[in-house]
Amino acid sequence: MANNFFYTIVDILFNTMHIFAILINCFGWAFKKTLRINLLFLLITISSWSILGLFYGVGFCFLTMLHSLSLDFFGPTSFPFSYLDYIILEKLNINTSSNIISLTSIFFVFSALAISLKRNFITKDKTIIWLLWISCICWLIIVNEKGIGFVPDPTNIFIFLTLLASFALIGKIFHQLLRKDF
């Protein structure tokens, strides 16, 4: 019974952290006080999905991994690769596909990043906007075809160019931040 109690507490704690991160990612741009944290969370999210995704699978989230490992401490679980799959499909029991959830998530994160960039600073470097939409569209195509959780094959030219666009996007935004252009 104690394990069940602690399992529930840990699950609630990680659910709270995940929901907080999702809300900041999607709506942090709407409030002046959360503009910078929104941009930071979005950059961390996209970096995790793509950079860490090279090693752990496209769409990888370190918070989801920690959530899964923490719950596994209390006994084996079948935690899905995506937190949104966990909450929407398993906890809320909503009848939809994992692929629809992933595609919607990609669209919302990149759209929120576009809004956040506009609200945080106005850049003369249109390359960032082009890289943002190229990354978004390419990830939508890749995830629609392959899903998430697969380790990308860098010899696939489309995946390679998508990763390159994402890395360039992240780098250019960080460069703007370091130059204090925002």
Where do the protein language model's features map onto the residues?
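Hydrophobic cores of alpha-helical transmembrane segments in multi-pass inner/ER membrane proteins
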Residues: A21-N25, T104-A114, L161-H175
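Juxtamembrane "helix-exit" motif on the non-cytosolic side of transmembrane helices
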Residues: A2, L54-G59, L140-V151
